[in-house]
Amino acid sequence: MQVTGSIKFDLKVDDQLLPRARALREQWGASERPVWIAASTHEGEDALILQAHQQLLQAHGDALLILVPRHPERFDAVHALCCGQFATVRRSAGAAVDGQTRVLLGDTMGELLFLYALADIAFVGGSLVATGGHNPLEPAALALPVIMGPHVFNFLEISAMLRDAGALQQVDDAQGLAEAVRQLIELPQDARRMGEAGRAVMQANQGALQRLLDGLARLIR
């Protein structure tokens, strides 16, 4: 028997992803704006995230939130929720973010890594509600500081590794989320340190897929 490790660490990031994201932020005129993403969110969580964004805007009035619901059937309802409070652009509509936009709704499929790449700070959803959280290695692979709520039971070991390395911070509620994002905006050296720690965890644990393939090759010889 051989333990190969988790293939989740073997996430490959396209070399053009970050340059494409930087170019789009420049096109938006948002290179200097604080941008944070709340990704893979669930019902009951979006309202908490928008509450956190409202609090954040009191300190950083130009902050942009990229909100990405986990399930496509919720896109319209979450869009309505956003529009009730903020100037909102739907990614699927192809409209550009401008200086008045406060929320970009990530309502497209297959773009999650690119949407992460547009951000400076990442909140991974399914964790402020008792869903168990989603994969924090996706933002870690892009050297983003990662925030999650208290419910991470789907990724207990991985979240513990990132937390112990100083790459992931957990918060309990909307107020804690707003405060965590605010601090990372105001202390960019801390944000960089968290991001670099996450990428180091990724790199230190890569190779499981190749070990698995090598093991399978030996078995079928």
Each model region followed by its residue ranges:
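Nucleotide-activated sugar donor-binding and catalytic core shared by glycosyltransferases
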Residues: 1-221
